[in-house]
Amino acid sequence: MLELKTNVIQDPELKDSLDLQENDRVEIIGDAVHYIVNDHLNRVFNYTVDQQKIHAALITTFASGKKAIVVILDDIGYVYYVGDNNNDSYIINVPFSTESAWSSPSGLYLQRHRSSDENLNTDLPHIFCLNDPLDELTLIKFDGKKILSLFDSIVYVVGEIVVTHNKKEKKLSFWRSRFIDPESDQSIKSSRNRRRESSFSREKNPDLTRSDSIHYTANTRLSEKFEEQGLAYSTIFSHIESFPITGSTSFDSILGNGVLVITTLVKELEKGYMMLFRLVRDRSPYFLDSLQLHAINLSAIKSKHLQKIVVLSSKGKVSLESPMSPSLPIEGTFRSFRVHGATLYLEDTDGVQRYISLDNRASNSLVKWCLSVIRYVLPLREYEIFYTGHLYALFAFKLSHDEAFISSILACFTFFSRDKVHVEPIEDCNEAYSLSSKFHFKKEILIASQLSSHLDYSTFKNYLMPLAITLHFISEELRLDSVVKPRKDQLVALLLQITTWLKWPRYCEYYNFDIAETFLSIPLSIQVDVEEPVGPTSILQWIIECLRSQSTVPFYGLESYGLPHSCSTMFPQTLSLMQLLDCLLNPNMTLQNLVEEMVRLGISRKRCERYPFGILCIIFTVLEIAAEEYSPNWESEELRLVNRLDVDSFLHPKTPKWVFNKQDQEVKEIKALTSTVTDSTLVDTQSFHPYKVVTDMIFREDRRLAEVNKLLNYSSQITIMTEHFDVDLSSVPMQQKVAQCICVRTLSVPIGAGMLTYGSKNPLPTEKVTPRLFNFTLHLHPGTLIIQPNKEFVTQELTEWPEFNVGVALGLSISKFSKEINTSWIMFNRPETLTAYHAGFLFGLGLNGHLKALATWHSFIYLTSKHDTTSIGLLLGLASSYLGSMDAKVTKLLSVHISALLPVGSNELNISPLTQTAGILGIGLLFHDSCHRRMSEVTMEEILASNESELKNEGYKLAAGFSLGLINLGRGSNLPGMSDLKLVSRLQVGISSQATFQSLEAGSPGAIMALTMIYMKTNDLEVAKKIDIPKSRYLLDFYRPDLILLRVAGKNLIMWDEVKADYEWVKYQIPDIMLSQFDLQEKKVLSSDDLLLYNVLAGICFSLGLRFAGTGNPKAKEILINFLDSFIRLCHLPAKTHDERVTAVTVIRCTQIVALSSSCVMAGYCDLDVLRRLRVLHGRMEPVNYGAQMATHMALGILSLGGGRYSLSRSNLAIAALLISFYPQFPRTTQDNRAHLQAARNLWALAVEERCIIPRNQDTKQPCIVPLNVVQKSGAVQKLEAPILLPPYDSISSVSTLGDKYWNLKIDLDNNSDYRELLRESQTLTLMPYDRTSSKEEPLNLFPKLKDTSSPLWNLVKTSRLFQSSNSPLNVASLQESNNKTSLGVKLLLSMDFDNLTRDRLLSLQILLQFFESCWTGVLLNKFHSRQYLFLSRDLVEDLSLRVWEYVYSHNHNEESV
């Protein structure tokens, strides 16, 4: 008798890891419950705090279908859902002590604990149901006369079967449970109408003890609870059968072939029982039979293929039993066993640990798949016999999984042989056939004959044909995967052996063509006559027929051979290919629909590469065409399938921003590093930033950015060429004068430097950022003289605000997309003593929104230090970070620094005027665009305040004006709830220069700015007239000249749409009385008579610069540069008299305004025309005040904003921010804040817009240079080369890439509203490299370039064995040039080698040829029109097809003659 052999566990530590229990379970360990999934601890639930005993823990599924863990304690229970994306938990009330809990099909059963003195005659229920954690407990209703008594306890539950044990009657009862909805069952309610006067009397017995009284009271309360609540019924129990059994200790069950087997063990009698129940869908289970076994231990072992009962007899023999399949004895004698998953662990009489697994854990997935398919084909009983033979082959004969499967298949056929195969001893058999060849099955047939002699395969008579056909379809499925060809060949050889025995000549011929090696068939005569079915079905031949007819022809599938339809799901590749071909040949389906179908079927690009090359050619042709004509509605899966990762990266970004890593930085050569040390003029102070690779690409044609770097460098030594000076620099006083001029110029640089380095850093969490310090050292060249300004000149007061600006530049250099900026990082970078550097740093972080991460209590620590610049930086930074949010905490912080917001009668604030100025400006930022009435009223009162004090100076009133404008920005007359404030009329009083109080004159700039910002872009002509300048000379004399500039700019910003970039518009803005003075080229001397003209022109240029900010408008640039040249010329005119000097000051101020306006228009473009003029302004050595130098460097910074990666927006907030930053009243000295708070000069950061489009190579992940075609809404077309700044997004219609190196990518912004926002957020175009060398353009030069081409068809053809002979047509064609495509086709045909051609290769080639033939006609012509590959001309395809068909015919004819 055959016995299964076990394996010895060599390492005891591995005994629990040999097999995973592929389910989840819970275990009670002390005061905790462990949830274990696949033998790995998943979660731990601890109940130490509850101080209650854990009575039960189980996994169940409630009526809602949700899976949950239920833990029952003394009086409460916990429910934890464990499904996908569901971590809900509930606490349930348990009004009794729980004896046991069991999982049910719709929740759980709870069995309460019964006390020993409980009245046994009561009908008080003791088993309850819980169907949902939010529901009440429900009761069980009984169908029939049989009911549960108080002595019945649930001992086992499996599916709908509930097993109860009655201790009193000593019997097992089997019940069928059915769930009913308690809410729908209105008639079924718990009725307890009888009074329980004898058992549950409401009167206490005075003779009861204390403990009796407590128990009595508890039961009374329980009874009352059930009676009062009227619990509903949710489950019906129907009695099936009862058996008198004594002392049952354990229960288990197995299910097979519709029969449920429940086992129980009576250890005292050493007996086990099997109760068999027939399960019928939608019907009540019924009892079949009961069996008795002699056993000292029983347990169920369940695998994917087999379910058995493990029986250990008193003699130590172990066997696997099942009423539905043969018994499987295990070799040896054993003391004990245990089951873990599908593995049986045994301990033999010598104490050796052994194991055996019923699951087929073969490394060969083909065997697993074949077993799964056969399981569908064979009935359960026959399959268990088949799998039993497989287990015998594995464990009795120690075969490999492949050999065991083949042996079990062959055993089904050898059972019916007339002449039994001679059986040799197993040991000799293993030796004799250990060197068996690849394609014969002597060893397997020998084993199969032994299996067929021990197992009863007689019922397989009707299943031999289905088995053979099933294996045939498995082999056809394998033909669609070129990777598994060796497995397919082995299966085909097996099929050839089987069909030889069955005498199926057509099938034998079909398989014989596939076997290149000599196959040794073992003769065997089968007694059963199995008629040869039609066929054989060939999936590849079917594809050829479909392509030839260009329609889907019938496919003889499994159903045609009488096999169950459910088997079809086991052949996914065949089904998928049939659906794809149907889609391809459907005239109503496009190639894009075919791609969508592939995604729906789960076909990936990697899976496509495993198809035979003929099918792969079709699919890749479709994918390549679809890649050029992708649908904008495609998801990531479709785009990845067609290899358009560029489009996928844009439409479905995995990260919101592509941030350069430190690994992306350029690696410098030693020579470049040493040159920066030996030659100070080559130092590039900004070259360290990670975006340098992009900026270098943007300005790759010259060194303009390097020049800006040098001009805005304030931390390196400055070299001065002495020959450029007309004065003698040999004297110390003159040297000091020059040094002091250069010192002031250096101090004015940081704001511009901050613009240049904006957003260039992404610091690490542990990285400490330090500001670059000022370097005032001068080197006079030629020579070696080094000079520095006197220490008395460089005071703390002199450098305080420049140091503040250095800190702001450092904070702004940190990208707003950095994720590592938090409270800890800010505190890590805080110096021990607060400095102006750190104050500016806080402001810079706030401008980029990073102060939202700063904890509130840290803000209080900063503010209580009473450090003025720190308070200013923090207040403005918080207001900027919380821009427009009206955050309550930040409002409180700002309010306590503004006297106007304190309650009446409050003490005077001990706060500097500059801090209060920052506070009032911060209110405007915090309440931006909110139309907040209270804040609007306060700021307006501050503008018009008449009291004179150091606080209420022009700078404070201007800040109040900006704040009022920000609160109501661009709202115009649409100010809800503020009509009674009469903003326009009251502000107009503040604007008037004829005011009674001189303090109102100080408030005029603030009033002008407030009115301008409130009515910005509204085109309100009435308000514009009120702010406009008068047209007569007499009235103009009443106005301050600098206010004229503000009025002109303000009026134009209100009349936004009227501003035009042409000279006619400029001329129209000038009053008639000044037209005669309009031509600045005629000015030869400086005269105060022209002050009004200069201010009017500067105001016009300022408004023009803001109107076209960031657009790069060439006409606006031309106008502004023209005026800039004129003003620069005026700056060089001599100013000797007082009148001339006064005029010169105005000319310099107007020059800076025009320069800033020019830079605004060309922001980020680093335009050379503007740069040349700014370089001249920077290089002036004559005494120029600090403000003029600051304006020049701000113009330089805005011109090269972010190294060319950023530009300016034209939103309302952006224009307002630029108006505040470039306010045309610049400080005279570094300490000057009287007219305008210097910190506010940094609000330009709120106007920054990232518009630099950065293409990057998908393969290398590096930026690359790509031509772009940008179509604007006006119809203008721009040819650009990215990386480059794009025009404003709202003016772009479409962006598309050009060139031959990458797939063309077109982004249509007009027809896809989401694309504009995607482009704004990503700024990156990921491009797929692609060789666009087209055979259509150069068909004659294609062959010499085959090694470089990326065409998938040629990649397949040139690697095919058909073309790898010594006279390969590709080699021949590459050596000759011809102007005739037909001659190339002849060369290809003449050099064809058809040796060793298998059926799959031939059919694959036929598919390829048939596909290209069909592409010229019918449905495929419409889909592939003008896109057929021209290197395979139609003549070539016809000739090659003829040769292939001739070869097929000759091959078949030769076989027939043989």
Swiss-Prot record:
Residues 196-210 have a biased composition (Basic and acidic residues). GO terms for molecular function: molecular adaptor activity; proteasome binding. PC repeats lie at residues 873-895, 959-982, 1006-1024, 1099-1124. Residues 186-210 are annotated as: Disordered. Keywords: Cell cycle, Cell division, Mitosis, Repeat, Ubl conjugation pathway. GO terms for cellular component: anaphase-promoting complex; cytosol; nucleus; pericentric heterochromatin. InterPro entries: Apc1, Apc1_3rd, ARM-like. GO terms for biological process: anaphase-promoting complex-dependent catabolic process; cell division; metaphase/anaphase transition of mitotic cell cycle; mitotic sister chromatid separation; protein K11-linked ubiquitination. Belongs to the APC1 family. The APC/C is composed of at least 13 subunits: apc1, apc2, nuc2, apc4, apc5, cut9, apc8, apc10, apc11, hcn1, apc13, apc14 and apc15. Component of the anaphase-promoting complex/cyclosome (APC/C), a cell cycle-regulated E3 ubiquitin-protein ligase complex that controls progression through mitosis and the G1 phase of the cell cycle. The APC/C is thought to confer substrate specificity and, in the presence of ubiquitin-conjugating E2 enzymes, it catalyzes the formation of protein-ubiquitin conjugates that are subsequently degraded by the 26S proteasome. Mutations to this protein prevent the exit from mitosis. This is Anaphase-promoting complex subunit 1. The gene is cut4.
